[in-house]
Regions:
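Basic phosphate/pyrophosphate-binding loop/patch that engages nucleotide-derived ligands
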Residues: 11, 39-45, 55-89
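Conserved beta-strand segments of alpha/beta enzyme cores
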Residues: 17-19, 69, 139-141
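Catalytic-core segments of class I nucleotidyltransferases/pyrophosphorylases
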Residues: 47, 54, 59-64, 77-80, ...
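Conserved N-terminal catalytic core of the sugar/cofactor nucleotidyltransferase
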Residues: 1-50, 119, 171
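Residue-level signal for beta-strand positions within conserved beta-sheet cores that form or flank
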Residues: 14-16, 82, 138
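Short, conserved catalytic or adaptor-binding loops enriched in Gly and charged residues
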Residues: 9-14, 87-88, 133-135
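Short, surface-exposed amphipathic charged segments that create phosphate/polyanion-binding patches used
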Residues: 33-36, 85-88, 156-160
Length: 173
């Protein structure tokens, strides 16, 4: 965390303010981390992007009204998650256990309303169970993204992404 703060400081280009939400010594996981950061988030809804993905997704696509509690960007299942996480029925995200034939993987890109986290207790908790509750209530929309996306959360996946990036640079893509 200190290296990120040292590198980026508290402002970026175009007078953007950067705020940091420090976690205690025990990592809070994604849900707990978002909940911990809510007092710093000035907009509702807000975008969350996992730090361990590589993508060319156009984030401007997320700048539209959000009628539900969450909107998830889903991708084709990578080798490390062949069964996927969720499915889509139109623009509604549904659970994989509904028998839907085409499961997809959560990309780590989502738009959320603070209301999704209202009943959560501060501390460590995963985002997935909270999303499953919201999906069961019909309050999560989604989209399927078919562009470039890779999970770089392991050394093997990071090396694969680096190789892909080098390949794209060489080809001029």
């Amino acid at each position: 965390a200190d290296m990120i703060i040292e590198r980026l400081g508290h402002s970026a280009q175009n007078d953007t303010q950067i705020c940091y939400s420090r976690e205690p010594s025990e990592a809070l996981e994604t849900g707990g981390g978002i909940h911990n950061a809510l007092p710093l988030i000035k907009s509702d809804p807000f975008i969350v992007v996992n730090g361990d993905i590589w993508t060319d997704y156009n984030f401007a696509n997320l700048h539209k009204p959000l009628p539900k509690l969450a909107h998830l960007v889903l991708v084709q299942n990578p080798d490390h998650n062949p069964k996927g996480d969720f499915s889509l029925r139109g623009s509604d995200v549904i659970a994989n256990d509904t028998g839907h034939p085409s499961s997809l993987t959560f990309s780590g890109i989502g738009v959320y309303r603070a209301e999704l986290f209202e009943k959560c207790t501060p501390g460590r908790f995963a985002l997935a169970p909270l999303l499953h509750q919201a999906i069961a209530a019909g309050t999560v929309s989604g989209e399927m993204y078919s562009g470039r996306w890779m999970d770089v959360g392991s050394p093997v996946n990071l090396r694969a992404a680096q190789a892909k990036a080098e390949e794209l640079i060489k080809s001029g893509s």
